């Protein structure tokens, strides 16, 4: 148990980024994530908004509870009561520690925008924070406290994203897009400010650190000006692309349903 939590440092060697142990480990979490999202989403598809929201409330409580537990353990393990400074929810993935509770407990347009934000970024964070968490799986053994809690919290983010769309909680209204952008840009500003003051690498705005962002970091030669601008631009473009694809799929689905209903009506008329 001491070895799992990393007290005194991990004695086992990391299996490595994209090792078969890494892939099998995170894939197990992804399977559970998708299965539970489909189960609860389909079960609550035609339930009231309050019933649908209960699942999201539990997701909010669980993700924050695991994260708080992780921070406490890491502060004890590192014998540093200020260790929480480098564990602030200012990564793209960990923003869900705030936005999932916001989606669960707020009301009106703020709730709609928060639900859309979790829907848009939850699944992205789940994939990036598990399969592409190069820094974690290069530094820690696969079966370790750090990787286990990270996999759990990222899976909850992905679960919330999938559950929202499967249960029909998303709105994706044009009028709420500015609020979604405002949420994202606010976190980017806070992350960059924290990076300068601590210093740290929240939101990977300073460097790639073994993530896919390394590609863009190298493209701009590590420029402290252009690199963070590129990262933020990628976030904005992702929102636009996600919204565009969602709108297109929604439109095509509605057209197919309309066409099917017309054919059904014509068949019924012919039978009469």
Predicted segments with their positions:
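Membrane-interface transmembrane-helix boundary segments in multi-pass integral membrane proteins
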Residues: 11-29, 179, 185, 196-239
